[in-house]
Each structure stands twice: as C-alpha cells, then as structure tokens.
C-alpha cells in the first residue's frame, strides 16, 4: 500500500510513496523524530512503512521542550509538538533514535517529556516501536529490561546469533541483521525470557518485545540508508582520528547494504501485528474516506509522485 504524510519536511513536496487507495483501510502512525537530520529520517522510515500491507498516514512530532539546533524554523513550521497531540489517539507510534546516548538521561532537555510519552502511549496508542536510543531510554525509565552504558561505540552491521522465540515479528525471517550505532547495550543475561526476541551474548539484545505494554524495542537502525553509517564514521573520525571503522559494512572500501531485506520484512511483520491488535479491538479498520466523511471533509484528493 502507500504512505501519505499529514505534515513534515517531505510534506512540502507533496511526497507520497506508491498508489494511495482511498477505499482501503488506513492506519494512523505518530512518528516522534529525535534525529538531527529529520528530513533524511523521514525518508528512511517512510520507505519502510510503504511496505506495510495497508495504507499509512504519518504525523511527525518533536518534543515540545527540545531545543532544536538544526533547521529550527522549518521544523517548527512543518512539525507538531507533543503538546499538540496529547489529546489524540494513534494506531501506532514510532520513536526514533537520538545522538544523546553519551549523556545522562536526566540531562537531556526532553527527558521528562519522554517519560510522559511512555506513560501516555499506554492509553493512547495501540502499538509502539522504539528504535536505538528510544529503546535505551524506555528500558531505563520503565525498568522492564536492563541497559548499560558503554565507553566504546558499537558500530557496524551485525547479525543476531540467537533467536529466542519464533515471534510473529520474525515471520519468514530465519535471521536478523541490522546496522548498530550506539554507546549502550541491553545485556542478554539480564533480560526476562518473556521479552527476548533476538540478540547476541556480546552485543546484547537486538529486538525485545513487551506484550504487557504492546511495545517493541530495537537496539539498532533498520531504517538506515546504505551510506548512513559511512557518513557517521566520517563525522566521528573528523573529531577523533582513532575512531574505528564500522564492522561488516565496507567491502572493497565501499559501504554495502546487507540489511534491507530484513528491514522491509520486519516492518511488514510489525504492521501485521499492529493490524491484528486493532482488529481485535474493533470490527473494521476505517478507510481514509470514511474518516474524512465523519469529519465532514469529503473525499480525499491526493497527488501521486
């Protein structure tokens, strides 16, 4: 199916991936974008969401308390803040990573708001997905799995050595490989068995699932483009010449994408899990036109690119 954007930097370009069918069921996803390059992150997640077997409408948000340092005017014009959405409900929520995993949580300017987001999602979101730092922060705040800060960065593309259970998130996936770029780990030995999906004894958990709060936690970056790890490496080595190259990533000195198939299939499985949760609580999932008619907006007209 297709993705249509309610707001965001891509919205300025009337950006739509695929063919949007207004009579097909549509789910609403809140994407809390904590990454500094928000346009790139929008593109990365939008591409993955386009593989879901259902139409997706995305609302991009930033924390109200966060001091934005890049493209401030464009972000404030094209994003909503979390204060704008506390009264709303969403079918799904994705919270991205953030380059703050070397800071103490309490020093992050939106930490209190992030903790409120965790509590809010229990009553306002059907299914949640936390990536990299967001997973780290959620584990620390809610104490449902251990997190540990590292002095050296884990950087590269790694395959899970352990699949702990054949969860629906891993349907048609014999293994999991994804980019990792983090200064933290979730030690396998400290994680409750009910939460484990995929991981490694050395690198820690890759994927965790907590059915009690309808949440999935990914410690890496399925969404990364082929060049993202390379760009991070070039940024870091300009600051510290001793920065180690990302592992299992450069072949013949060129970045190689070996995770895309895993990423696309994982997001399809997550979308199907979300749809299953939604249909168990309601008889049907509304179409885009049904939602617009209920609001008195009439049928939708979309521009396809």
Swiss-Prot record:
This is Homoserine O-acetyltransferase. It is found in: Cytoplasm. Substrate binds at residues 153, 181, 235. GO terms for molecular function: homoserine O-acetyltransferase activity; homoserine O-succinyltransferase activity. Pfam families: HTS (PF04204). The gene is metAA. Belongs to the MetA family. One of its GO terms (cellular component) is cytoplasm. Keywords: Acyltransferase, Amino-acid biosynthesis, Cytoplasm, Methionine biosynthesis, Transferase. Its main location: cytoplasm. It comes from Leuconostoc mesenteroides subsp. mesenteroides (strain ATCC 8293 / DSM 20343 / BCRC 11652 / CCM 1803 / JCM 6124 / NCDO 523 / NBRC 100496 / NCIMB 8023 / NCTC 12954 / NRRL B-1118 / 37Y). Gene3D superfamilies: 3.40.50.880. It is an enzyme of class 2 (transferase).
């Amino acid at each position: 199916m297709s993705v249509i954007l309610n707001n965001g930097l891509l919205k300025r370009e009337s950006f739509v991936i695929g063919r949007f069918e207004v009579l097909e069921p549509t789910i609403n996803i809140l994407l809390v974008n904590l990454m500094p390059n928000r346009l790139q992150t929008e593109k990365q997640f939008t591409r993955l969401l386009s593989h879901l077997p259902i139409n997706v409408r995305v609302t991009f948000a930033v924390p109200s308390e966060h001091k934005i340092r890049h493209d401030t005017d464009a972000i404030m014009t094209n994003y909503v803040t979390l204060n704008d959405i506390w009264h709303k409900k969403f079918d799904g929520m994705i919270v991205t990573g953030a380059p703050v995993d070397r800071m103490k949580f309490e020093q992050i300017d939106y930490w209190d708001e992030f903790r409120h987001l965790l509590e809010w999602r229990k009553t306002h979101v059907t299914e949640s997905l936390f990536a990299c730092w967001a997973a780290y922060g959620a584990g620390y705040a809610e104490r449902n799995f251990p997190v540990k800060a590292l002095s050296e960065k884990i950087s590269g593309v790694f395959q899970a050595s352990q699949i702990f259970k054949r969860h629906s998130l891993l349907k048609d996936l014999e293994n999991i490989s994804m980019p990792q770029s983090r200064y933290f780990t979730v030690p396998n030995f400290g994680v409750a068995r009910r939460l484990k999906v995929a991981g490694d004894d050395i690198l820690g958990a890759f994927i965790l699932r907590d059915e009690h709060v309808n949440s999935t936690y990914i410690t890496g970056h399925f969404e990364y483009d082929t060049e993202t790890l390379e760009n991070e490496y070039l940024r870091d080595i300009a600051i510290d010449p001793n920065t180690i190259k990302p592992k299992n990533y450069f072949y013949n000195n060129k970045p190689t994408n070996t995770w895309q198939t895993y990423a696309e299939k994982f997001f399809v499985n997550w979308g199907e899990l979300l749809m299953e949760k939604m249909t168990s609580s309601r008889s049907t999932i509304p179409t885009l036109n049904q939602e617009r008619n209920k609001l008195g907006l009439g049928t939708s007209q979309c521009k396809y690119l």
